[in-house]
Amino acid sequence: MTNTNELTGKVAIVTGAGRNIGRAIALALAQGGASIVVNARSNRAEAEAVVREIESAGGKALVQIGHVADAAAVEAMADAAVKRFGRIDILVNNAALRREKPFGQMSHAEWREIMDVTLDGAFHCVQACLPALKKSGAGTVINIGGLSAHTGAKNRAHVVTAKAGLIGFTRALAHDLADDGITVNCVVPGLIGTPRPKDKPEPAHHLTHGTITGERGKPEDVAASVRFLCGPGARYVTGQAIHVNGGAYLGA
């Protein structure tokens, strides 16, 4: 890993960091010199693999298993971060669920499941980390949104609504936390090359559909934007939804 050290001395919590975009974000922030709390809901093996990758490159990392919808588990995660590393400077709310269901067939429990993770999870994480973020003097919160919040998407009313709410949450927090020196931004991925279940392969025409670049993004593309927003070059950037989707927002 190339380490330019712009995040040296900082501590980052990344939720949903065991795979895909979350994993890429954890690795990118570690490349910048940050110590990483790698959160996963239940898959310890995946989280430990990310920690090993960080440590093998000379970084520092900690596994913290816990469901972001569980306020007590999130409090324990924040406490573990401070106990191990002494501080929290960066929080990346990446944990999310991928679900599809026609709205007319959707149960309230299915609706609630998405809200619990995406919105309540972000709420719990910011609340738990806020005292440490304030002490940082230059704290950063990054929420990972989704292009569907702007375009809508069939059979994903719950996901679309939650991601749209996350953008509103970002803008509200940017106001609320500015006096504490905390920036709050949302990164909005589009078509990103992450593995799908074998029984639900991605249709070929979806691979670049809507992008104006004609290519599909990688988790590392999202991670690079997150890393920038966590660094000194983004000190004057807050309350923004940064689209990382090959211009799909323009072509939608």
Residue ranges and their predicted role:
Residues 11, 18-20:
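Conserved glycine-rich cofactor-binding loop
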Residues 131, 175-176, 235:
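Alpha-helical segment proximal to the catalytic Tyr-Lys
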Residues 2-3, 151, 205, 227, ...:
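Short C-terminal tail/terminal secondary-structure segment
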Residues 146:
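Residue(s) in the substrate-gating loop at a strand-loop-helix junction
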